[in-house]
Regions:
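RNA-binding basic/glycine-rich loop and surface signature characteristic of RAMP-family CRISPR effectors
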Residues: 1-173
């Protein structure tokens, strides 16, 4: 966000305690603030499944079990019609869950001087998966500017960006 000269980063997310040495142990309350935007959880809406069609590598599938929690949250937040910009193939609930049971699992290992220190496994969501999340905010002008920035480029969310995790394209629906 700093490369875009976004002046309201603290307003959106709150102050970053780690940026300011004065804020050790939250002692400097004038610099400590909570963000004014609320980002609700991202719910899986559609999942890429291998296509048997020669012209397409994958198709996006969804089901009522994936859509219902999104619709319920939208209703609870007062969002009457959120528009899905893509059409997905509606699958029977059990069939799509079979695909979801087989998410890729990647073994990760921390090496220290060539010696294995810690082996763990991570389940990853395939590229091209579609999620929906909602944002509530207190300032329309700040939100418009923020929204423009997050839709311009890829955004990296969460950890492990150095190994390609968490990169996403955000599109307003």
């Amino acid at each position: 966000f700093s490369s875009h000269k976004f002046a309201y980063i603290d307003h959106v997310f709150g102050s970053d305690m780690s940026r300011d040495a004065e804020n050790e142990n939250k002692k400097n309350e004038k610099e400590y603030s909570v963000g004014n935007f609320t980002f609700f959880q991202a719910n899986l809406l559609a999942y890429p499944v291998q296509s048997l069609d020669n012209g397409t590598n994958y198709i996006l599938k969804t089901n009522n079990g994936l859509k219902r929690p999104i619709e319920d949250l939208a209703k609870h937040l007062g969002v009457e019609n959120y528009i899905q910009s893509e059409s997905f193939i509606l699958e029977e609930d059990d069939q799509l869950y079979t695909h979801l049971e087989h998410l890729p699992v990647i073994a990760r290992n921390k090496l220290e001087d060539g010696k294995s220190e810690n082996l763990w496994y991570e389940e990853v969501v395939p590229a091209e998966s579609r999620f929906v999340f909602f944002v509530s905010y207190d300032n329309e002008e700040i939100f418009k500017e923020f929204d423009e920035i997050i839709q311009k480029e890829l955004i990296q969310i969460g950890a492990n960006g150095s190994i390609g995790y968490g990169f996403c394209k955000i599109t307003k629906v």
